[in-house]
Amino acid sequence: MATQLIENKLKLLPEKPGCYLMKDINGTVIYVGKSKNLKNRVRSYFKSKQVGRRAELVREIRDYDIITVSTDKEAFLLEITLIKKYQPYYNVQLKQGTGYPYIEITREHDPQTRLTSIVCKDGGYYFGPYPNVYAAQATLKFIQKVFPLRRCHGYQGRPCLYYHMGQCLGACFKKVPQKEYDEQIKKIKRFLNGDIGAVKQDLTQKMEQASEQLEFERAAEIRDQLKYIEETVEKQKIISNDNTQRDIFNYYVDKSWISIQIFFLRQAKLLRRETRMFPLTDITDPEDAFTSFIVQFYGQKNRVLPKEVLIPAGFDNDTLAEVLTVPVRTPQRGQKKSLLDMAKDNAKLKLDDKFRLLELGNRKTKGAQKEIFDALGLPYGHIIESFDHSHIQGADPVSALVVFKDGEPDKTAYRKYKLKGEVEHQNGGDEVRNTREVVRRRYGRLLREHKKMPDLILMDGGQIQVDACEDVLRNELNLNIPVAGMVKDDKHRTNHLLFGDPINGVPLKLIPLNPKSEGFYLMTRIQDEVHRFAITFHRRRHAKNALSSRLDSIKGIGPKSRNKLLRKFGSLKKIKEASVDDLRAAGLTLPQAQTVKLML
């Protein structure tokens, strides 16, 4: 249902291309979209019945902004910029990077080959990415042996060890002719582009010779080299009749979800494939979600553009090609059309599997979280945050925060807090101070950084923790976030939520959850997770401080020497096991090393 503000703004919408930013009650941008006609697109959110994820979005919209542009290309680029800036909840968020390594030939006066996960526009040559990291490492070592460039750190006035082994051209002690480097680089590029027949034949002969001479370890080593070369360079059968680097995109839509399949063709082989699936915010225009995904996909760090992108029919290929700066084509027949159809079949297969798993998992995640919000009489929220404290008789106090989004842990958002100072002993006052400090630090920072607030805070404790948390939120930070306590029974088992709104005349009361419900299981899981996280952090901190204290008690070992030992060995056990020479290698003098051995 559109508010009066939205109704008034809808009348002023222009019939121009551009982007729109949907905002919630807090003014947070929750969705960014683009359209060739802003008037028609934005009005469609409020003038027709919505279902699925789009219905959820519309229920949360309280305002919107628009930005007009001149062309579709500008709308594409602006949409990606806005999504990166605001990271809206209802937009698909792509993870950065592939996680796979590349083999790089560096662009330097004395070039070298190396593995890297970062692709830069520095004029170097990049090959990959390679899904099998171990095979990529082994292939790199093979290249460095057979096609040497530079393996040392550069000129040092004398030949390096690798030069004597035939794995360095000698930049360590002389000027290597550029022609020599160019010839080697040409061979490496030919090898990594799939021309490996001669190399394989040579290795096979050497393996057979080693076997005939009963050098079985050497034969096995060569056999492994052949296997790794096949993993990285020759992994797939040839499925194309040219060597053009291509990425193939196709998609399938069902039940307000889109599944996108990507095939990566390199050296005429299917190197690997990826599948991405996400719920559609605008079910009426899946084509827009598909093209936006492609632009975002190549906007990620370490994504290397191919020479050509293939997509199905029905899209503005010219605009997409202009945005990506590579040709975008739609094959009509032949082998490329077959690959495009295969990508769609795979997208459908993956989505069908997803639905079967969703039916099982949704009851335990999003459905379970809804049960908690329903029990508290709150509208559904996506983010729950929970705190717990840990210390031993007041020593080394810490707090931990866990975050659950739609019923699942978001471990990238977990946080650890070293509490300032030490408390004398554990009592209610200490819990109050710990709670106030960590709540102030957490949500004060979110305010300063204009980050999204959680929809519910669960404190691991009773009224003391809830009151302390609400006092800081409302009276210091001017925030109105619902806070509930997870209350345990006399057997230390969670059995109720403590919730209310005393400021508005609603006293705190115990709210039971059905012990057999998914909501109860989720609450227990959140409490177990925050307790585990806090205890683990405290144990590590306490062990580290105990080790520091033990070292500080040794005469002649000051803070600098202590830190050297901690960096080198990490634990008291390893320091005890270290020899005097090992201790000296860590940076201690001979008398210091002897004293440490004697005292420990």
From Swiss-Prot:
One of its GO terms (biological process) is SOS response. Signal peptide: none annotated. HAMAP family: UvrC. Belongs to the UvrC family. SMART domains: GIYc. InterPro entries: GIY-YIG_endonuc, GIY-YIG_endonuc_sf, GIY-YIG_UvrC_Cho, RuvA_2-like, UVR_dom, UVR_dom_sf, UvrABC_protein_C, UvrC. It holds the Pfam family HHH_5. Its main location: cytoplasm. The keyword Nucleus does not apply. One of its GO terms (molecular function) is DNA binding. Residues 15-92 form the GIY-YIG domain. Residues 197-232 form the UVR domain. Interacts with UvrB in an incision complex. The UvrABC repair system catalyzes the recognition and processing of DNA lesions. UvrC both incises the 5' and 3' sides of the lesion. The N-terminal half is responsible for the 3' incision and the C-terminal half is responsible for the 5' incision. This is UvrABC system protein C. The keyword rRNA processing does not apply. GO terms for cellular component: cytoplasm; excinuclease repair complex. SUPFAM superfamilies: C-terminal UvrC-binding domain of UvrB, GIY-YIG endonuclease, RuvA domain 2-like. It is found in: Cytoplasm. Keywords: Cytoplasm, DNA damage, DNA excision, DNA repair, Excision nuclease, SOS response.
